[in-house]
């Protein structure tokens, strides 16, 4: 297995994984939208995406987005997406992707990584095993824009 930073040139190998990831979260399959979304993130340099491959085949990814902590005066990343293809799960690929993201943050001297997950996501055990701590100091709220785009 190899983990590397993906580029715009990797989009075609990422799209099937990204589309499957969205389907997992009950979104309709739409490879064209997945391709457009990823292409825009890469073009605007808005993400860092680590791609896991086995014998050259893309099998998993994690995607990070940069943000900042005004209190600590340091940047940190939001680990927004983590996905491993069904047939490659339980092989340590998810763990390797998470560890790679942590190493990347250490190298960049970022404050850390934040992630959110569903209450019933079994990966919570993995996150805690790898050093993530459940933040019980804050409540997280989200406002949804219900107006349609023009």
Regions flagged by a language model, labelled:
Residues 84, 90-103, 129:
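Conserved acetyl-CoA-binding loop-helix of GNAT-fold acetyltransferases
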